[in-house]
Amino acid sequence: MLDREGYRPNVGIVLLNSRNEVFWGKRVGQHSWQFPQGGIQHGESPEQAMYRELHEEVGLLPEHVQIIGRTRDWLRYDVPEEYLRRQHATRVHRAAYRGQKQIWFLLRLVGLDSDIQLRASEHPEFDAWRWVPFWIQLDAVIGFKREVYELALSELARYLSRGVRMHQLAWGSPLDLLQSFYSKGEEGSPESSKTDKSK
């Protein structure tokens, strides 16, 4: 389902723990990390899509989380043509499809870490996860999504405590933060990552 401009409606999820750290998932078989996200199906509201994607990708139910806030409007990113070719998209789809437009939700985990299950669906999105600081360096995110991630985090930060917001002002852009985050262990497979133990 595309809009008139060729963007697919989508939701993104920033999941917080009690320390205001965020869920960071490693994509199956890849070295890239990202937040949970997924398309909005026909007839779904953004909130309904968010809960469905939350369960499919992270294994959490509505009772495991609290909605803190969401972005005011859609945030968009374009998918490069070369990426679409690698994904074997059809010519018709490539001609119409430009990228994603996303509503981002900020959630608080009120359940336990053990409630997170990466194999809740038949086609898992992630094979490892970890908690990371809110202003995570975005080098491990695929390039064309980084600007939207920065915009989403910057807008959602208004819902957090003053201390976390002031951290943004002190350090500047999230892209400049935590330069040594992936210096421990091999990049893309941090030693402290939590893997899916149900395999």
Curated annotation (Swiss-Prot):
Its EC number is 3.6.1.-. NCBIfam families: PRK00714.1-2 (NF001935), PRK00714.1-4 (NF001937), PRK00714.1-5 (NF001938). GO terms for molecular function: mRNA 5'-diphosphatase activity. This is RNA pyrophosphohydrolase. Residues 6-154 form the Nudix hydrolase domain. Accelerates the degradation of transcripts by removing pyrophosphate from the 5'-end of triphosphorylated RNA, leading to a more labile monophosphorylated state that can stimulate subsequent ribonuclease cleavage. It comes from the Bacteria. It is an enzyme of class 3 (hydrolase). The keyword Hydrolase applies. InterPro entries: Nudix_hydrolase, NUDIX_hydrolase-like_dom_sf, NUDIX_hydrolase_CS, NUDIX_hydrolase_dom, RppH. A motif (Nudix box) lies at residues 38-59. Its cofactor is a divalent metal cation. GO terms for cellular component: cytoplasm. One of its GO terms (biological process) is mRNA catabolic process. It comes from Polynucleobacter asymbioticus (strain DSM 18221 / CIP 109841 / QLW-P1DMWA-1). Keywords: Hydrolase. Belongs to the Nudix hydrolase family. RppH subfamily.
